[in-house]
């Protein structure tokens, strides 16, 4: 039986909120089978628990934001992406601010934290959402689509007309049957443009953004002294984001994701469209390992890590 997973022990870290610029303490705790991933604002007079769910995503302008009863937890996508990559089904996530810390702008720090805590199997079948028919959402020239596929693969095309991005490639495809999330996706950093950062700061946002946690571009080049971690790091980060955005559906997806210029908002619309059509998906488990997609077999790699 392909089983659910959580972490073995509590682990915590401190980082900076990308938009608030404030210090955030993040604590990850083991959770029982069938809990899902539950975020808790422990800094509020009465702690508010917000389970990760497609319907709980509110604001998506600059990040994926979970909302409930007036409480928010922002920028959840990188941590959710790491959980997906390592096959974590159940986890308590405690934060003392309204943002998950940005760390280095990728999912690598969260992968390290989760691996440091240890990952253990639980005595319950891992549930998957299998895409049964194609679902597509569009917004202008932007597109996001899920298609039936026995595994998990993603194809993403970006369209940033910028010399530094043009040089690295605007399209990337990955099939986790034969590719490692930790090696090929987790280290890809978020990126932004210097003129946009200035405008965001005037709005009280991006106060924690720096060359330490993002790739920053001016009109012509990259401002960071550090080299790119991947030749096509920009589009790989978009895939990292998409994996995290899709994982708020509550279970790993068995299907293929195709996107053109998609973002957090369109990704969430795609999940809602999928869930709204009961003929488009089914929840499945695998009693026999040999019946499961290779991408999710633990003897190959944890989840698709």
UniProtKB/Swiss-Prot annotation:
Q: Which GO terms describe its biological process?
A: lipid A biosynthetic process
Q: Name one GO cellular component term.
A: membrane
Q: Which Pfam families match?
A: LpxC
- Essential cofactor(s): Zn(2+)
UniProt keyword terms in alphabetical order = Hydrolase, Lipid A biosynthesis, Lipid biosynthesis, Lipid metabolism, Metal-binding, Zinc
The catalytic site is made up of 264 (proton donor)
Where does the chain bind Zn(2+)?
78, 237, 241
One GO term in the molecular function aspect is: UDP-3-O-acyl-N-acetylglucosamine deacetylase activity
- The EC number(s) given in the record are 3.5.1.108
Q: Which family does it belong to?
A: Belongs to the LpxC family.
NCBIfam families on file: lpxC
* PANTHER family reported for this sequence: UDP-3-O-ACYL-N-ACETYLGLUCOSAMINE DEACETYLASE 1, MITOCHONDRIAL-RELATED
Q: What does this protein do?
A: Catalyzes the hydrolysis of UDP-3-O-myristoyl-N-acetylglucosamine to form UDP-3-O-myristoylglucosamine and acetate, the committed step in lipid A biosynthesis.
Q: What is this protein called?
A: UDP-3-O-acyl-N-acetylglucosamine deacetylase
**Which organism encodes this protein?**
Cupriavidus pinatubonensis (strain JMP 134 / LMG 1197)
């Amino acid at each position: 039986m392909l089983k659910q997973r959580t972490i073995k022990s509590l682990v915590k870290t401190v980082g900076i909120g990308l938009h608030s610029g404030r210090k955030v303490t993040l604590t990850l705790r083991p959770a029982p089978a069938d809990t899902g991933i539950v975020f808790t604002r422990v800094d509020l007079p009465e702690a508010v628990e917000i389970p990760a769910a497609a319907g709980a995503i509110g604001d998506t302008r600059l990040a994926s934001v979970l909302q409930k009863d007036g409480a928010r937890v922002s920028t959840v996508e990188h941590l959710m992406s790491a959980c997906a990559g390592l096959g974590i089904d159940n986890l308590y996530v405690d934060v003392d601010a309204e943002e998950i810390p940005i760390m280095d702008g990728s999912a690598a720090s969260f992968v390290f934290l989760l691996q440091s805590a240890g990952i253990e199997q639980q005595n319950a079948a891992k549930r998957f959402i299998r895409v049964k028919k194609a679902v597509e959402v569009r917004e202008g020239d932007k597109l996001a689509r899920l298609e039936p596929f026995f595994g998990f693969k993603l194809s993403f095309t970006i369209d940033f007309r910028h010399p530094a991005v043009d040089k690295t490639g605007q399209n990337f495809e990955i099939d986790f049957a034969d590719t490692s999330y930790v090696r090929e996706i987790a280290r890809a950093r978020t990126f932004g443009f210097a003129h946009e950062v200035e405008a965001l700061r005037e709005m009280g946002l991006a106060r924690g953004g720096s060359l330490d946690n993002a790739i920053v571009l001016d009109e012509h080049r990259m401002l960071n002294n550090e080299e790119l971690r991947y030749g096509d790091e920009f589009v790989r980060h978009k895939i990292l984001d998409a994996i995290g955005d899709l994982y708020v559906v509550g279970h790993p997806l068995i299907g293929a994701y195709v996107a053109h210029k998609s973002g957090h908002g369109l990704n969430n619309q795609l999940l809602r469209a999928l869930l709204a059509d009961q003929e488009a998906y089914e929840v499945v488990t695998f009693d026999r390992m040999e019946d499961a997609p290779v991408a999710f077999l633990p003897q190959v790699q944890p989840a698709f890590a």
